[in-house]
Amino acid sequence: MKIGIPREIKNNENRVGLSPSGVHALVESGHTVLVETNAGSGSFFEDVDYKEAGAEIVAEQAKVWDVDMVIKVKEPLESEYPYFKEGLVLFTYLHLANEEKLTQALIDRKVISIAYETVQLPDRSLPLLSPMSEVAGRMSAQVGAEFLQKLNGGMGILLGGVPGVPKGKVTIIGGGQAGTNATKIALGLGADVTILDVNPKRLQQLDDLFGGRVHTIMSNPLNIELYVKQSDLVIGAVLIPGAKAPRLVTEDMIKQMKNGSVIIDIAIDQGGIFETTDKITTHDDPTYIKHGVVHYAVANMPGAVPRTSTLALNNATLPYALMLANKGYREAFKSNQPLSLGLNTYKGHVTNKGVAEAFEMEYKSVEEALQL
């Protein structure tokens, strides 16, 4: 199989689809890998590293897309849509429930698109989303602490406080991978942390995990309102695989927050959980202020720590990439149910129910679409 690794072109996206070690594994399995010039430089992998791993370095973006399978990090941007072709396997993060134009382009060009974030194991865990959720969760608490500083628009609060001064209050909505990792860092910074989740069993696990050092609260509209309005930092970390994020924090709740408080919307790439995060921001211009509250809505947070993120992502995605390359997509889907759940579009059909519902499109199961 011929495989392409393009350079990411999203604002300040410094990750790369595969590390040199990942490329080496594919080449050793008999596949041809084309890597776009400087694709890995943002993660401090140079062209020579890929060349030594057995890749062919190409300067033309069109050439790296003229392959059997493209492995990326983030969803293609509009300038990349012309490279789509029938039968192309696209393996990357997609978040299609918030990307109608991209979804339509994938359907029109009959691309076989596999979204990292919807590959799901029998225990409902998301193995290809998990490493980036860990990174984004940990970053969210660090970023929140930074933007609480007065010079960054915040109210000038130190999350850990000092003797005789109260700690900053952090509320985390969602107790999954991102929320759990946000909690770890917020606790490490010395904050007073509350985490809300809809699952009582998960709250029990979090209470055990953190030894009673966090407040675990059932997530419902009244509790969300109560804790949001008294918080200095609110982190949104709710995910429904493949579907748009639920808008759990209303504009009225935001209006009740203190001036200079901060919200971090980790779920912004799926539409966000705050009614007031009405636009996606970038690492170049990461925040805006609305109702006196600092809003951080960067969709590719892990892109700011690309070396760590690329290596973590490569560890998770490489076994699936090898499966697709070695077996071909039909046999890979047939033999691996978790991977088949990652299929979002197949030759003109939407094969993810959450995406179909988001845009009122016709849905076909993977089995129907592939006639397995």
UniProtKB/Swiss-Prot annotation:
<dbReference type="GO" id="GO:0042853">
    <property type="term" value="P:L-alanine catabolic process"/>
</dbReference>
<dbReference type="InterPro" id="IPR008143">
    <property type="entry name" value="Ala_DH/PNT_CS2"/>
</dbReference>
<dbReference type="InterPro" id="IPR008142">
    <property type="entry name" value="AlaDH/PNT_CS1"/>
</dbReference>
<dbReference type="GO" id="GO:0000286">
    <property type="term" value="F:alanine dehydrogenase activity"/>
</dbReference>
<dbReference type="InterPro" id="IPR007698">
    <property type="entry name" value="AlaDH/PNT_NAD(H)-bd"/>
</dbReference>
<keyword id="KW-0520">NAD</keyword>
<dbReference type="Pfam" id="PF05222">
    <property type="entry name" value="AlaDh_PNT_N"/>
</dbReference>
<comment type="similarity">
    <text>Belongs to the AlaDH/PNT family.</text>
</comment>
<keyword id="KW-0560">Oxidoreductase</keyword>
<dbReference type="InterPro" id="IPR036291">
    <property type="entry name" value="NAD(P)-bd_dom_sf"/>
</dbReference>
<dbReference type="InterPro" id="IPR008141">
    <property type="entry name" value="Ala_DH"/>
</dbReference>
<protein>
    <recommendedName>
        <fullName>Alanine dehydrogenase 2</fullName>
        <ecNumber>1.4.1.1</ecNumber>
    </recommendedName>
</protein>
<comment type="pathway">
    <text>Amino-acid degradation; L-alanine degradation via dehydrogenase pathway; NH(3) and pyruvate from L-alanine: step 1/1.</text>
</comment>
<feature type="binding site">
    <location>
        <begin position="169"/>
        <end position="199"/>
    </location>
    <ligand>
        <name>NAD(+)</name>
    </ligand>
</feature>
<dbReference type="GO" id="GO:0005886">
    <property type="term" value="C:plasma membrane"/>
</dbReference>
<dbReference type="Pfam" id="PF01262">
    <property type="entry name" value="AlaDh_PNT_C"/>
</dbReference>
<comment type="function">
    <text>May play a role in cell wall synthesis as L-alanine is an important constituent of the peptidoglycan layer.</text>
</comment>
<dbReference type="InterPro" id="IPR007886">
    <property type="entry name" value="AlaDH/PNT_N"/>
</dbReference>
<feature type="active site">
    <location>
        <position position="95"/>
    </location>
</feature>
